[in-house]
Amino acid sequence: MLYYFLRYINEMFNPPGMRVIEYLTFRASAAAITALLITVFAGPSFIRFLKSHFLEPVKEEAPEEHRKKKDVPTMGGLLIILAVEISALLWAKVDDPHVWLIMLAVLWMGLIGFIDDYRKVVLKIKGGLAGKYKLVGQVALGLVVGFYTWNDPAFSVLLSKTSVPFLKNFSVDYGIFYIPVVIFIITAVSNAVNLTDGLDGLAAGNAAIVTMALGLFAYLGGNAVYAGYLSIPFISGAGEIAVVSMAIVMACVGFLWFNSNPAEVFMGDTGSLALGSAIAVIALMIKQELLLPVLAGIFFIETLSVSMQVAWFKFTKWRFKEGRRIFLMAPLHHHFQLKGWPEQKIVIRFWIISILLFLTSLMTLKLR
C-alpha cells in the first residue's frame, strides 16, 4: 500500500529520486529491511506474551537435550507471518495475483498450524490437530492455487507446463494432472518444513536460503531478457514474487535473532506450515517446482529419513516379528543428536549443505 501512495506522490509532484519506487530491487530491499525490523524490534515483547501463554510441549521420546527446552514458548511463527504480511502489503503490488496467492498461503497454513499448536499447548491435546484435518487444509489450499492459476489470464502462458532443470527449452505438461500435482507439492513441502523444525534455527535458516534462491529465480523469470538468455520460463509479473520472497527471507533471519541456539522462541507448526506452503506456491508459480528436490534438499532428506524409518520398521516387524530402525531416531537431525553431535554443529552443517544446494541450483541456469 505504501508503494501505491509513493507512486501517487511521484505522479503528482515528481520529487527527485521518487522514481526509485518503480524498481523491483528497491522494493525487494525495502520489504526485506521492513520484515527484519519488525521481527527484531517486535520480538522481545512478542516472546514475553507467548511465554505467558504458550510453552512448547516436549515429546517423551525426544532426545535429552531437547527436553531441556520445555520452558521455551512456541507459536513464534506468528511473528514471521506478521512481518511477511505487513512487508508485502507495504512494498508489493497487492493487486498482483502472484502476491496475494503467496499471502493467502502464508495466512491459511499459518492458521492451520496455529490451531494445531493451540490444541497441543493450551488444550493439552496430545498430537494437536489430527493429521486428516491438516491434510484437508493443505488440499484446500492446493485446490485454490491450482484452479486459480489454471483459469486466471495472468498464468495462461504456460498453464499446466513446467520447466525441467538441466534441460534447455524443454518443458513437461502435467495436463489434467496439474491440480493434483499442485496439491501434492503444497502438501509435501509444507510437511517437509514442519518435520525439519526440530532444532534451534534449523527450519528458519534453511527456509531463508531456499526462499532467497526462489526469489532470485522469480526476479530473473519476471524479466523477458534475462529469462530468454537463461532459457527459463518468462512469467509476466513474477518480479513481484521477489519482493515477497525477500520479506520471507528476512523475516526468517529476524526470527533467527531469537531462535538461534539457545532458542528463546520456537516457530511451531504455525511458522513451519506457513513457510513450507509459501515455498511451494512460489516454486509452482515460477515453474521451478521440479528444482525443489535439489534446492530444498535438506527438507527432502529429512522427510525421506522419516519415510524410510517408518517403512523399514513396519517391514521388519512383519518379516521378523520385531521392528528395526535404520536411524537412531527420525527425522535425520535427531539421529545426529543421538550420535553425540552438538546441536549447533548439526544446524550449521545443514545450513552449509543448503548453501551448496543453493549454488547448485543456480548452476542449473547455465547447465542446460
Swiss-Prot record:
Cofactors that this protein relies on: Mg(2+)
Its membrane topology: Multi-pass membrane protein
UniProt pathway: Cell wall biogenesis; peptidoglycan biosynthesis
InterPro entries: Glycosyl_transferase_4, PNAcMuramoyl-5peptid_Trfase, PNAcMuramoyl-5peptid_Trfase_CS
Coiled-coil regions listed in the entry: none
CDD domains for this protein: GT_MraY
Compartment annotation: Cell inner membrane
GO MF, one annotated term: UDP-N-acetylmuramoyl-L-alanyl-D-glutamyl-meso-2,6-diaminopimelyl-D-alanyl-D-alanine:undecaprenyl-phosphate transferase activity
GO biological process, one term: regulation of cell shape
Main location: membrane
Any one GO CC term of the record: plasma membrane
Catalytic activity of the protein: UDP-N-acetyl-alpha-D-muramoyl-L-alanyl-gamma-D-glutamyl-meso-2,6-diaminopimeloyl-D-alanyl-D-alanine + di-trans,octa-cis-undecaprenyl phosphate = di-trans,octa-cis-undecaprenyl diphospho-N-acetyl-alpha-D-muramoyl-L-alanyl-D-glutamyl-meso-2,6-diaminopimeloyl-D-alanyl-D-alanine + UMP
EC number: 2.7.8.13
Keyword vocabulary terms for this entry: Cell cycle, Cell division, Cell inner membrane, Cell membrane, Cell shape, Cell wall biogenesis/degradation, Magnesium, Membrane, Metal-binding, Peptidoglycan synthesis, Transferase, Transmembrane, Transmembrane helix
Transmembrane segments: 30-50, 72-92, 98-118, 139-159, 170-190, 201-221, 238-258, 262-284, 345-365
Enzymatic class: transferase
Family: Belongs to the glycosyltransferase 4 family. MraY subfamily.
Function text: Catalyzes the initial step of the lipid cycle reactions in the biosynthesis of the cell wall peptidoglycan: transfers peptidoglycan precursor phospho-MurNAc-pentapeptide from UDP-MurNAc-pentapeptide onto the lipid carrier undecaprenyl phosphate, yielding undecaprenyl-pyrophosphoryl-MurNAc-pentapeptide, known as lipid I.
Protein's name in the database: Phospho-N-acetylmuramoyl-pentapeptide-transferase
Origin species: Chlorobaculum parvum (strain DSM 263 / NCIMB 8327) (Chlorobium vibrioforme subsp. thiosulfatophilum)
Gene it is expressed from: mraY
